[in-house]
Curated annotation (Swiss-Prot):
The keyword Metal-binding applies. Induction: Repressed by MhqR. Strongly induced by stress due to exposure to 2-methylhydroquinone (2-MHQ) and less strongly induced after diamide or catechol stress. Not induced by oxidative stress due to hydrogen peroxide or methylglyoxal. Its EC number is 1.13.11.-. Its cofactor is Fe(2+). GO terms for molecular function: dioxygenase activity; metal ion binding. It comes from Bacillus subtilis (strain 168). This is Putative ring-cleaving dioxygenase MhqE. The gene is mhqE.
Length: 303
């Protein structure tokens, strides 16, 4: 089996309004779905992505105002990399610095990028990537020559880096393509969301909270999802059953390095309950929560 790369990455945030502002107004992503955490309906679940919310472009957040700050470290995904067109780094450097962010210009595996944290300390990077195409979602001040095209990949901090690398190469179809500065780069054939970096010697233990990643989701077709269950079991990794998340179905498991992984389907996508023009404009609830809409909206912070 081979995954088609990343489906989405989900992280914790604290302030829902600030989370919305930063990812839509500063990074220029589209809010493609505003819903709730199905396991905790008193917490929003925001999905940001390209114009359609295509797999591989999606960054999602659980913003919980009562959350304490987390610590990025072992047992987590660390930095999330976004792709932008070649030649656009100077634009992003100016834009991010105007937003008050501290940046580090860095070349990773021969690719130029900007390393920074978002306004709630989640580690991010913007990397030039000629292979990722261009985005049609261009909010004010951003053109197709600069707009984020999707996720490039993530950096993993594993308790057992070699076991994580073995799982991704032997069971998920990734290939080791390079190693530098104690980081191994793995790649799939996906043009968007195709890169996984694994740090060989992470130091700190990760602690969940705002500013940290909750889980990393990999893509699959719906007809292929059940085939992943025996693969996960063969690696002696307990998994969830297949869960309906409205816009995809999911299987969750924690790999041997302590990182929570998900296998998520491309189908049905985010236009099951909203048109293209309506995406992200209203609070959407699954049918089983719709009868509790008033109680839920009374709890949720006003945006």
């Amino acid at each position: 089996m081979k995954t088609e790369g990343l489906h989405h990455v989900t992280a914790f945030a604290r302030d829902p309004q600030e989370n919305l502002r930063f990812y839509t107004e500063v990074l220029g992503l589209r809010l493609v779905k505003k819903t709730v955490n199905f396991d905790d309906p008193g917490t929003y679940h925001f999905y940001f992505g390209n114009q359609n919310g295509d797999p591989g472009t999606i960054m999602t957040f659980f913003p919980f105002q009562g959350s304490g700050q987390g610590t990025v470290g072992k047992g987590q995904a660390g930095r999330v990399y976004f792709s932008v067109p070649s030649g656009s780094l100077s634009f992003w450097k100016e834009r991010l610095e105007k937003s008050g962010l501290s940046l580090e210009e860095k070349t990773l595996f021969g690719e130029k990028g900007l390393i920074f944290d978002d306004t709630e300390d989640l580690p991010l990077a913007i990397m030039e990537d000629a292979k990722s195409g261009k985005s049609e979602w261009t909010p004010d001040g951003i053109t197709t020559n600069e707009a984020i095209t999707g996720m490039k990949g993530v950096l993993l901090y594993s308790y057992d880096p070699q076991a994580t690398i073995q799982l991704l190469t032997e069971s998920f179809g990734y290939t080791k393509v390079a190693e530098e500065d104690q980081i191994v780069r793995l790649a799939s054939s996906a043009a968007v969301g195709g890169v996984i970096d694994v740090h060989l010697h992470p130091e700190k233990r990760g602690v969940g909270g705002y500013g940290t990643v909750h889980h990393v989701a990999f893509r699959t077709k719906k007809k292929e999802q059940a085939k992943w269950l025996p693969i996960i079991a063969e690696n002696h990794l307990p998994s969830s059953e297949i869960l309906d998340r409205e816009y995809f179905t999911s299987v969750y498991f924690r790999e041997k390095g302590g990182i929570l992984f998900e296998i998520a389907t491309d189908e049905p996508g985010f236009m099951t309950d909203e048109t293209f023009a309506e995406l992200g404009t209203s609070l959407k609830l699954p049918e089983w929560l719709e009868k509790h809409r008033q109680q839920i909206t009374d709890i949720l912070p006003e945006l």
